[in-house]
Amino acid sequence: MRLTYQTPEDAQLETMLPHIDILADSVPVDVLGKIPGYSDTVVTRPTREYLFLHETAIIGYHGTLFAAWYNSPAEELKGHTPIRGARSFDGGKTWSAPELIAYDPSGKLLYCPPVFGICDDTLYLLCNTMVSADHMHSLEFYRYDESDEKFHFLRSEPIPFKLNTNVCTLPNGKLLLPGRIAEMDSFPNTPAVLISDSGKIDAPWRLVKIQENGDLPDGSKLVHPELSAIIQDGLITIFCRNDLRKVPLLYQSGDGGETWSGPISHNIPFSSSKIYSGTLSNGKNYVIGSLSGRNRLSIFFSEPGTLEFTSGYDIRNGYDPVLDLYPQFSYPVACEMDGKLHVIYTMQTPERQKCIRGAMITSFPISCAACR
């Protein structure tokens, strides 16, 4: 079933694009319930030193959950902006005190965002540096050392490519990083991927643009084309954020990310905030995003091995009186470990303090009814 749009401009763009329905008509998007068996845990709260937090990441490695994010003193991407992180040794129930991972002592560069990857049983963290908010300068690589439990700097590459998801492994053994590219020290509005032909993280990566620029067929432009992938057999499907037009977009590649078709409109109503997607160990795909602005964070599940999404739940919906959280929950990232899917995201304190943010995790068993 196609979506109903509130503006003629949105409706016009959809008519100009190829379209696929991937969400079943039977899914009651407006009245999704809470996912069965869930638990919520605050990973880190705002502090006097760092009132602002955003763009979290999470991964499971050797039985430990690793989380990371960027902080700023008071406003988004202003002032001292480091990458910090925490670990959980009990499946996300409790978290260690935040630790510093990467920063610029001179204060000239901003660090944002972090992503994780595992290669040859080694954990890596990758992050960007910026000369100002979302003006990309470099891509940095860090490797985790279990002997001292720290991430160590490996190298910096002058690649103005903004990261968005953890490292993906392709069926051909190569690695994929979805994101967006810019000119050096400029704003990235062109969707693209990086590919590691060697299948190694600490190796050269090459750029493939998904489209030549950020223009859409109706003359509007992609602003923050944040990407997230589902990889099944020979098909890569990438969901793309679309700010100016509330038309959900995706791109597809059948040759390992070398060439792309799209944009294609679809009917999962995620558009103007970050989307995260992946595949569970049981073969079901999932996609997570914000509904109704950012006051709802929801997840949809597919049938195994397909892009037919037949069930969905809310991860968060509205004001939380227990935690006193204003309803803005956004920028999800997820990983599966020990039979659970762990979803980390930005949380926000009450509306009167819109720039005060922390990180939260919702975990639930993949044996729940929707995930089986």
Predicted regions and their residues:
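Asp-box/BNR beta-propeller blade signature and adjacent active/binding-site loops
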Residues: M1-R372
